Amino acid sequence: MLVRIPNVLTPEQVQHCREVMARTAWVDGRVTAGHQSAQVKRNLQLPEGTPEARELGDMVLAALNRNPLFVSAVLPKTIFPPLFNRYDADGEMNFGSHVDNAIRTVPGTGMRVRTDVSSTLFLSSPEEYDGGELVIEDTYGAHSVKLPAGDMIVYPGTSVHHVTKVTRGSRIASFFWTESMISDVIRRAMMFDLDMSIIRLNADHPEHPSVVSLTSLYHNLLRQWAQS
């Protein structure tokens, strides 16, 4: 299930991120890659744990917690602290086909996060760079994603995906993983579809008795399937 989440960050927040990044040193992105991913990863990354990375990560987390579409699509239990990467044309940067590690350990805590859902939050406008598409593969084929700054795509962590070579400009983004309360992707998609249907029904027929019964069904399913 791929879900586009628009306007996660405001233009002002995106601009603030870019200003902070402009005065921060970047490191080789392979520092956070697993063995398989490191062989195909060619990009730069903000160092984890720096004041700048923590400030921007906290901004993203606060925005996610205020976003009902993200909560509905992902049903977040634990969000890995957001990371930030950059792909430059002059370095012929790209990220070959790979699958994200199933488990990520939060640095300095020992906390392990199961990567049920992967997310990419775009911080560069499409007009700023050529190439750099995020290509996600599923049973229906390959989906190429290149969104406006401030918009985000979420997709199953089990997906094979890659980032094409940037041939002009720079592509800047935040990326992170979420452990969902519902680990099964099919059940999670069903819950999202049910929630969206309830919202549409309530908007069209707010007094319809099915709104209450379907809402009850949603929460009872969540009780059955959610992992504490």
UniProtKB/Swiss-Prot annotation:
Instruction: Name the EC number(s).
Output: 1.14.11.-
GO MF annotation, one: 2-oxoglutarate-dependent dioxygenase activity
Looking up PROSITE patterns in the UniProt record yields: FE2OG_OXY
Listed cofactors: Fe(2+); L-ascorbate
UniProt keyword annotations, A-Z: Dioxygenase, Iron, Metal-binding, Oxidoreductase, Vitamin C
* SMART domains in the cross-refs: P4Hc
Q: Which residues form the signal peptide?
A: none
Residues binding Fe cation: H98, D100, H161
Pfam families in the cross-refs? 2OG-FeII_Oxy_3, PKHD_C
Give the source's domain of life in one word.
Bacteria
Q: Does the keyword GTP-binding apply?
A: no
Q: Which InterPro entries match?
A: Oxoglu/Fe-dep_dioxygenase_dom, PKHD_C, PKHD_hydroxylase, Pro_4_hyd_alph, Pro_4_hyd_alph_FE2OG_OXY
Domain Fe2OG dioxygenase, which positions? Answer: 78-180
Q: How is the cofactor bound?
A: Binds 1 Fe(2+) ion per subunit.
Q: Where does 2-oxoglutarate bind?
A: R171
Gene Ontology BP term (one): DNA damage response
Protein name, per record: PKHD-type hydroxylase Nham_3637
The organism is Nitrobacter hamburgensis (strain DSM 10229 / NCIMB 13809 / X14)
